[in-house]
């Protein structure tokens, strides 16, 4: 039996978190795993989103009528659980109003549920797409202030998020900002940690891409990119292929706004402090909280935005109805809810990924490259991954890795097809090849015919022009040579020759036409 109680109702229960002034207490073991059959305690309301990791749903806990978010993962083999367990271990350490709360997990037959805070207004990336415009400076100030408070807490727990971006910063109906998605987060044991490349390309810090020692200030760099993203609508270099962007970030000067003059000097200064390339000179989250731009944040700056987002959310829900029937299981394959994504993000998210030994499995839409995998060519600007060169002109947003295409996302592989389906696929493949060969032959024949026809048309037009010219010249000669000056024999020769020439040319022209 799974329950959620108000504070003080049962001191023997385990306190999990305190979202929205409600203390969630549940019957769980020491690892916060819910008792068997816990999934029946929830009523799935709608599908909130879908990513490489799986899907997120809004659910109602029946006995308490509390809304929560369920992050569902498909499990196909034992090692699929490892990245999920890693995210859970990070979430278990967090109990802060600026970080998404973790309520527990449920392991089912072929899926895994993580139960978390429900932030009804979704991410700031989604809100920006819904309202169709970027945010005001006063709104950005408060968003960044609360995000910094979340980072201060995470860093105090020795947790580096490594994937800070607007899509991972959420907003609830009370105007509370929360950091989410710890799929590529890392628990560090020392001040510096040299490790793998992780995160989303446009938001990555240069020290990660250059594979030098880094610390928790990589999250500050990412937050600086978020500041530009919220102001300009997209991160710097968003028009560039992700792999090319990764090369450029490590070698170019720090980015800034598209038009810095549009923003206050305090805002520009804040971004400069975040995007200092020297990690030792870059400000920490605690220092940034004392920056004039952050200290100017008003507590009610998000009130108008929150109300607007609530109205848009309600309007959208009424127009499309619930995307998941309460009787359906969350992993129903018939449920689709495509989120609006900026065009630059579709490069990263709207493709299927293939597995690779050099790409780490994550529970987010981000990628982890193992240490010493990534290197750049200063001369060509190409990206080399285990001696495999990825072209700069690759517009698909994919990474060529040892002849495999790896998108910036990870997903468990589906079970292998049955023997019958393999045979069927082979037959279909043969038929397709035969059809392609037939189409190629038809195309070749048609092309040859068109070529010959074009040549004949050209010859015909030339003959036609020349025939008219010959006729004109012949008449001109006849007119200049009076027939009366010729004897009867020569007159006949001229006349018959002219008529014969005209007749031959006419027949020739008619044949080619």
From Swiss-Prot:
Domain Protein kinase: 42-294
Ranges of biased composition (kind: Low complexity): 331-357
Residue numbers binding ATP: 48-56, 71
Record's subcellular location: Membrane
GO-annotated biological processes: intracellular signal transduction; protein phosphorylation; regulation of MAPK cascade
PROSITE patterns reported for this sequence: PROTEIN_KINASE_ATP, PROTEIN_KINASE_DOM, PROTEIN_KINASE_ST
Cofactor(s) it depends on: Mg(2+)
Entry annotated with the keyword Transferase: yes
Region (Disordered): 313-358
Gene3D superfamilies, A to Z: Transferase(Phosphotransferase) domain 1
UniProt keyword terms in alphabetical order: ATP-binding, Kinase, Magnesium, Membrane, Metal-binding, Nucleotide-binding, Serine/threonine-protein kinase, Transferase, Transmembrane, Transmembrane helix
Chief location: membrane
PANTHER family membership: SERINE_THREONINE-PROTEIN KINASE PAKE-RELATED, STERILE20-LIKE KINASE, ISOFORM B-RELATED
Protein name (Swiss-Prot/TrEMBL): Serine/threonine-protein kinase pakH
Record lineage: Eukaryota, Amoebozoa, Evosea, Eumycetozoa, Dictyostelia
């Amino acid at each position: 039996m799974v329950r959620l109680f108000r504070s003080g109702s049962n001191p023997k229960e385990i306190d999990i978190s305190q979202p929205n002034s409600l203390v969630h207490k549940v019957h769980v073991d020491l690892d916060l795993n819910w008792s068997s059959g816990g999934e029946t305690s929830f009523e799935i309301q709608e599908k909130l989103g879908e990513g490489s990791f799986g899907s997120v749903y809004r659910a109602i806990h029946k006995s308490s009528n509390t809304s929560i978010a369920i992050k569902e993962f498909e499990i196909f083999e034992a090692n699929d659980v490892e990245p999920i367990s890693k995210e859970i271990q990070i979430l278990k350490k967090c109990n802060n109003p600026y970080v998404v709360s973790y309520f527990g997990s449920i392991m089912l037959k072929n899926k895994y549920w993580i139960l978390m805070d429900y932030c009804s207004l979704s991410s700031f990336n989604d809100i920006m797409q819904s309202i169709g415009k970027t945010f005001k400076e006063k709104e950005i100030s408060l968003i960044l202030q609360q995000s910094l408070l979340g980072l201060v807490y995470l860093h105090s727990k020795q947790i580096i998020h490594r994937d800070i971006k607007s899509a991972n910063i959420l907003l609830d109906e009370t105007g509370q900002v929360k950091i989410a998605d710890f799929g590529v987060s890392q628990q560090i044991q020392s001040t510096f940690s040299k490790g793998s490349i992780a995160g989303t390309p446009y938001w990555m810090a240069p020290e990660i891409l250059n594979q030098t020692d880094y610390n928790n200030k990589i999250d500050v760099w990412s937050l600086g990119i978020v500041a530009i993203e919220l102001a300009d609508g997209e991160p710097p270099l968003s028009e560039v292929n992700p792999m090319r962007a990764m090369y450029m970030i490590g070698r170019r000067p720090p980015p800034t706004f598209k038009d810095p003059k549009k923003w206050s000097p305090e805002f520009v200064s804040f971004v400069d402090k975040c995007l200092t390339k020297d990690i030792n000179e870059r400000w920490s989250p605690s220092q940034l909280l004392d920056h004039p731009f952050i200290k100017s944040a008003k507590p009610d700056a998000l009130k108008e935005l929150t109300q607007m987002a609530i109205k848009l959310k309600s309007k959208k829900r009424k127009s499309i109805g619930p995307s998941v029937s309460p009787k359906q299981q969350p992993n129903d394959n018939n449920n689709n809810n495509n989120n609006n994504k900026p065009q630059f993000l579709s490069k990263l998210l709207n493709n299927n990924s293939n597995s690779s030994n050099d790409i780490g499995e994550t529970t987010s839409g981000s990628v982890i490259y193992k240490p010493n995998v990534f290197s750049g060519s200063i001369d060509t600007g190409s990206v080399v991954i285990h001696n495999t060169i990825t072209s700069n002109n690759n517009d698909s947003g994919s990474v060529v890795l040892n002849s495999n295409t790896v998108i910036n996302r990870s997903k468990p592989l589906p079970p292998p097809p049955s023997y019958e389906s393999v045979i069927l696929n082979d037959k279909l493949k043969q038929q397709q090849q035969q059809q392609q060969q037939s189409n190629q032959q038809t195309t070749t024949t048609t092309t040859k015919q068109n070529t010959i026809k074009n040549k004949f048309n050209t010859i015909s037009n030339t003959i036609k022009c020349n025939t008219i010219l010959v006729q004109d010249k012949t008449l001109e000669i006849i007119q200049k040579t009076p027939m009366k000056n010729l004897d009867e024999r020569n007159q006949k020769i001229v006349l018959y020759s002219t008529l014969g020439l005209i007749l031959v040319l006419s027949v020739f022209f008619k044949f080619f036409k």
